[in-house]
Amino acid sequence: MDQEYQRAVTRICVETALLLLQHGAESAVVVQMAQRLGVALGIESVECALTANAVLLTTLSKQHCITTVRKNVDKGINMQIVTDVQHIVVAVEHHLYDLSMAQKKLDKLKSLKYNRYLVVFMIGLSCASFAHLSGGDMTICAITFIASAIAMFVRQEISKRHYNPLIVFAITAFVASLISGMSLKYSLGNDPHIALASSVLLLVPGFPLINSLADILKGYVNMGIGRWTIATVLTFGACLGIVFALNLLNIVSWVG
């Protein structure tokens, strides 16, 4: 195996790891996919180290090592990309793709974009469903739907302008709490506290928290702590938005 081929394999392995990490895969999956791809392409050994903002990968072939580093920029959770990358790796393992074909497939990957208004509607519907499950009447469900849908629209607009995620979460929580808080201020529905609590459920960073726990349990402690820290900061931003909205409405407590 010549060094040029090894360099090409190193590049595709680190690109694979980077794509998975950027789109929300847990650390064990990222490392395993990079290693499996390298071995399938004829590399003796692939070592991969992850940090919150970088991927470090080394390939070994005939006692010759090549190491490369790529900066990690979070692109949001997207399981479609993660699944497509895994399919490419499996295809290489089954000798359906060679190096050049696998590289072309990776280069052509594009994120699946849902219609933004469909996302707004579904977010509103899901939060309203939680309100219904919590015992809210139709008035509470309607208020929750409106508050969460408008908050999601605002979140999309702010995110398009690439604001800091902490600011995005704070403003989104502020908008949702301000609208749903009207039900508590003017005693609308059977239990206004349900609307206030359900309308901000779109901001719960459940996936990062689950991934952080999975990383820690599987030995990737630094990645687990990093992801847990990010999720905690985002939750803090949401709390700030809720507190500001409640203060503006002069609501002392939202506990029923």
Can you say where each PLM-predicted feature lies in the sequence?
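Alpha-helical transmembrane segments and their cytosolic membrane-interface
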Residues: 73-126, 131-140, 230-239, 250
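Soluble N-terminal domains of membrane-associated systems
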Residues: 1-97
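C-terminal ends of transmembrane helices
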Residues: 105, 149-162, 210-222
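Catalytic cores of large soluble enzymes that bind and process phosphate-bearing ligands
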Residues: 5, 22, 26, 77-80, ...
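Generic detector of multi-pass transmembrane helix bundles and their immediately adjacent loops
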Residues: 185-256
